[in-house]
């Protein structure tokens, strides 16, 4: 534990070496605190250790788990893309792949003219919120003062 690094690169993202490992991993898009803790436990690492003390072998182990978490023993319900639309596999996407998958999902919904796709096109709320008072766009009309 002598070699401390202030910046640790995991899955193409620079992590803060001064933070606890589980909190440092949340800097990777697509990884929350619960998933980060699971990755630490599966890798056999202490989630509370400083990320700067990771060795290269431990970083490789974390990257392997992130590449295919279900194969390494992380439960299926914890992944962010169970039963993927194209492949049918349980995937956990991170960084740019996650952004692309979300964009493709929205484009597919728009292409098939699903209700959610149309709401995305129009820039309206997708999940059933009311729109009478919120989600208003455009110029606001000011209130004129009463003359004395």
Curated annotation (Swiss-Prot):
SUPFAM superfamilies named in the record: S13-like H2TH domain (SSF46946)
Xref: InterPro entries: Rbsml_uS13_C (IPR027437), Ribosomal_uS13 (IPR001892), Ribosomal_uS13-like_H2TH (IPR010979), Ribosomal_uS13_archaeal (IPR019977), Ribosomal_uS13_CS (IPR018269)
GO biological process, one term: translation
Domain of life of the organism encoding this protein: Archaea
Coiled-coil features, chain-numbered ranges: none
GO CC entries: cytosol; small ribosomal subunit
PROSITE patterns: RIBOSOMAL_S13_1 (PS00646), RIBOSOMAL_S13_2 (PS50159)
MF terms (GO), sorted A to Z: rRNA binding; structural constituent of ribosome
Pfam family, one: Ribosomal_S13
Keyword line: Ribonucleoprotein, Ribosomal protein, RNA-binding, rRNA-binding
Family: Belongs to the universal ribosomal protein uS13 family.
Task of the protein: Located at the top of the head of the 30S subunit, it contacts several helices of the 16S rRNA. In the 70S ribosome it contacts the 23S rRNA (bridge B1a) and protein L5 of the 50S subunit (bridge B1b), connecting the 2 subunits; these bridges are implicated in subunit movement.
Subunit structure: Part of the 30S ribosomal subunit. Forms a loose heterodimer with protein S19. Forms two bridges to the 50S subunit in the 70S ribosome.
The protein, known as: Small ribosomal subunit protein uS13
Annotated organism of origin: Pyrococcus furiosus (strain ATCC 43587 / DSM 3638 / JCM 8422 / Vc1)
């Amino acid at each position: 534990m002598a070699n401390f690094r202030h910046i640790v690169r995991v899955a193409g993202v620079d992590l803060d070496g001064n933070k606890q490992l589980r909190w440092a991993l949340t800097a990777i898009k697509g990884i929350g605190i619960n998933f980060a803790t699971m990755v630490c436990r599966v890798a056999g690492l202490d989630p509370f250790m400083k990320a700067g003390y990771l060795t290269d072998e431990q970083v490789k182990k974390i990257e392997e788990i992130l590449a295919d978490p279900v194969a390494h023993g992380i439960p299926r319900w914890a992944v962010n893309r169970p039963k993927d639309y194209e492949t049918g596999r349980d995937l956990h996407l991170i960084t740019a792949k996650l952004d692309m998958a979300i964009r493709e999902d929205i484009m597919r919904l728009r292409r098939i003219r699903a209700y959610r796709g149309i709401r995305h096109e129009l820039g309206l709320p997708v999940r059933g919120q009311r729109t009478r008072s919120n989600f208003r766009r455009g110029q606001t009309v000011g209130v004129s003062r009463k003359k004395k």
